[in-house]
């Protein structure tokens, strides 16, 4: 009776739909020591359920032939099937799933004893990780099962995947909200206790904490509620506190018991906060318009008359005196002059926030017009196609 407590939905709806869209469907059920069988054609039973033999095992075999009257194409994409079956094997540690493609004599076997830990490891392969995988499983008092695995890597993207009763929610929901709240609280608490925020003079957000994070959040809920039939967002209100409490306890303990990992994670988060602040300053700088110059270009820039970047040249010269000489000798139509101080910052070795705070670098960014940072940079906006130093 407990087998279906955490199912994905109404039992039988899936097979009923497949049956309706198939020219033929065969059911073979091993149960109570017998083999039961029934066949359908275009959704209608050919004969009633009958016993055709004896067996000691239990299980169900479903075979179906997609209807060519309904579908113009009935070719199965093995990659899509493999992706979903691999996912199911990760979500159910120890369950062995075999996918055979008899068209090309290919067999995939999915069997992951490590469950979600192996899921995170699979996603993070080829990336440099900052900590060993954190993984816990717990059962809340209200019958909700919570399982989380996570690891930070050296990339800048957040990759958090959420599942309810093995069904993916691409739009997240209450389990994601609970996870994020606990993660941010746990990390902030650790950094405050270690006095890192005051020492580094940064304000950290949830987005900073999740930069480079790979996580799987899987919940088992007795009666889940979703925002739509496609189950893309979980809306069960009781799930958020269950996930938040479980994550709070387990993650706080992890940070205390793994000081080296906690230090590496905190360092990445502080870097992310600095980069975010630097990017904000960069955006403000590139968008800021000069009160005296409508184009918002640097005051020292002697721009050219030509508006076509392909025909325009920018000369970067050292100091105001050289700038004066260059301005006198230039072709105003196509040559722009930008005087810079002799020795500006070595941006290859400088941190992003230090680079942005340099007035000379800022002037250069504004003059070139491309913007800066992952979200703002656009080389198509370059104002000069020839740059002469």
Curated annotation (Swiss-Prot):
The keyword Transcription regulation does not apply. It comes from the Bacteria. One of its GO terms (molecular function) is DNA binding. Keywords: ATP-binding, Cytoplasm, DNA-binding, Isomerase, Nucleotide-binding, Topoisomerase. One of its GO terms (cellular component) is cytoplasm. Residues 312-389 form the Toprim domain. Pfam families: DNA_gyraseB, Toprim. Its EC number is 5.6.2.2. One of its GO terms (biological process) is DNA topological change. The record marks 343, 346 as: Interaction with DNA. A type II topoisomerase that negatively supercoils closed circular double-stranded (ds) DNA in an ATP-dependent manner to modulate DNA topology and maintain chromosomes in an underwound state. Negative supercoiling favors strand separation, and DNA replication, transcription, recombination and repair, all of which involve strand separation. Also able to catalyze the interconversion of other topological isomers of dsDNA rings, including catenanes and knotted rings. Type II topoisomerases break and join 2 DNA strands simultaneously in an ATP-dependent manner. Belongs to the type II topoisomerase GyrB family. Heterotetramer, composed of two GyrA and two GyrB chains. In the heterotetramer, GyrA contains the active site tyrosine that forms a transient covalent intermediate with DNA, while GyrB binds cofactors and catalyzes ATP hydrolysis. This is DNA gyrase subunit B. The gene is gyrB.
